[in-house]
Amino acid sequence: MSNLSSKLFRGNLVIRIAIGLVLGVLLAFISPEWAKSVGVLGQFFVKSLRAIAPILVFVLVLSAIANKEVGTDAKLKPILVMYVLGTFLAALTAVVFSFIFPTRLELVSSPGDLTPPQGIGEIIKTVVFNLVDNPLQALANANFIGILAWAIGLGIPLRYAAPSTKIFLNDLSEAVSYVVKMVISVAPIGVFGLVAETIATNGMNAFIGYARLLGVLLGAMMTVIFVLDPILVYWKIRRNPYPLTFICLRESGLTAFFTRSSAANIPVNMNLAKRLGVRDEIASVAIPLGATINMAGAAITVTVLTLAAAYTQGIYPDFMTALLLSIVASICACGASGVSGGSLLLIPLACSLFNIPNDIAAQVIGVGFIIGVIQDSAETALNSSTDVLFTTAVSQAEDRKES
């Protein structure tokens, strides 16, 4: 028992998380009531991550830009290209899987208090309005687009500030990073609570009726994770991409799978990027930006569920129409973080391409909520792990050129 306690509280973080995961599963099967009770540990962990993430991003970006080194802008451009390309290829992969495995839905009612966006213009409007949000509201509401805008806006003039100001900002950044390390250190306990509550509440039989739909979704996501993303990484680093891919999956994807929040996983990704040698001035901008626009998982969800809705209505789109859907899904996915409800609420917008009525599209959202425990977890794991994967790959490629 003392050996187990040592591993759980002082050992390697990944091993500790794995132990917490296994213990959570066991508790859910042994005593579901107790498992639901310990769910508060998981809720506390997620709330802690969400609480620290906005101030972490603001302080780190502000400090990084104020102390910015020459050449950072050149490194951000290829990272943005990777984000956009990865999201589009993910949507295209979802189209291919949906064509090979066409899926019909058992439609149910969706929650009545949800209001999906009415068009791409509304999504763009949301993003632009978030960009000029009040800085205090942006921090309070975890509006990362607004936080980035204010941090960059203040950071640029602070590059000309006195050295003492830059030292203060750097010290403040170190202090926030220390708090983040403290929060991450309790990740095994948080994962234990999240897993125990999830399995005790939903059970393993809740997803059988939607096994085919989940199979298409997860198959597309796995293809992106283990085939397309490594190809993109190899394009940058020109060596075996899988060691880096597996590190990012193990240390970022696993946590994101259970927190189901890209924003909450930002501190985890920042910590991992630092250990992988990514400079702070790169990671502090690229990682939060990735949590906002790098949405491969969301693009897959929107594409698969939209095509499933089309098949259910007897609509069989040709490949060019599906290609257009991929482009629309990619654009929509980039705005998913700016829409309450995430990728599921963007489905009616994509369904409008096929003239699918809004009431049918709303029922597709209901299906999304049924499978959401698995779908949202896998989607977030893909989204968040590729943030740090692409950032690290570009950083290593640029460092190799400079050496």
From Swiss-Prot:
Membrane topology: Multi-pass membrane protein
Pfam families, sorted: SDF
Gene Ontology cellular-component annotations: plasma membrane
Biological process terms in GO annotation: serine transport; threonine transport
Protein's cellular compartments: Cell inner membrane
UniProt main location, coarse: membrane
Regions that span the bilayer: 11-31, 51-71, 81-101, 138-158, 175-195, 213-233, 285-305, 319-339
GO molecular function: neutral L-amino acid:sodium symporter activity
Reactions it catalyzes: L-serine(in) + Na(+)(in) = L-serine(out) + Na(+)(out); L-threonine(in) + Na(+)(in) = L-threonine(out) + Na(+)(out)
Domain of life per record: Bacteria
UniProt keyword list: Amino-acid transport, Cell inner membrane, Cell membrane, Membrane, Symport, Transmembrane, Transmembrane helix, Transport
Protein family (similarity comment): Belongs to the dicarboxylate/amino acid:cation symporter (DAACS) (TC 2.A.23) family.
Physiological role: Involved in the import of serine and threonine into the cell, with the concomitant import of sodium (symport system).
UniProt name for this protein: Serine/threonine transporter SstT
UniProt source species: Haemophilus ducreyi (strain 35000HP / ATCC 700724)
Gene: sstT
